[in-house]
Amino acid sequence: MDQYTEKKWQEAWSKSKIFQPALDRNKKKFLITVPWPYTNGSLHVGHGRTYTLGDVIARYKRITGYNVLFPMGFHQSGTPILALASRLRNGEAKAISQLTRDIATYEPEQNIQKILKTMVEPKNIADYFSDATVKDFTSMGYSIDWSRRFTSADDFYQDFVRWQFLKLQRLGMIHQERYPILFSPAENNAVGEDDISDGDIDKVSIEEFNTITLI
């Protein structure tokens, strides 16, 4: 199918709000979610596979009579975006190259440096690639209800996560203990393997040493 025809039908779907389910008590309800993309760069072919599978299921359920809700969120929290902005502010060549390449996926060359300069602020990285992902998913023809778009950085979502932790703590299902963790002095924050360059390859481990005092 040529791009003109694709765009024609994508615009028709959007105008008719065909993927925004209305209340229908005569239909069974079906909610599908797919893990949200992390918004620190452009998408790759693996994303295409993941979200195409979700879309196939959503469409199949629609044609078999279900009232389907297929929303989409964006993962904007966590230290990788903060670290990327920090590396950009520090002028790290690898970070500059990575973002330049990713921006070039969506922008003409004359716009790249202007956009790159804004990305010293983490929120600008997250928001730019969230918007870019919407365009990618729309061009793929995914049957997502964009009226319910949200991010993990939204106030209501942060409040919901906080409520979950406090609720579980009050029920005695989670508790805080002292335990060795990965920690970044630069960010003054705990980090996971995904936050560390080659963290899944060059693993940090706890070493134990026994000392013997000779008298």
Indicate residue ranges for each PLM-predicted region.
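N-terminal, positively charged nucleic-acid-binding surface of large information/translation enzymes
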Residues: 1-215
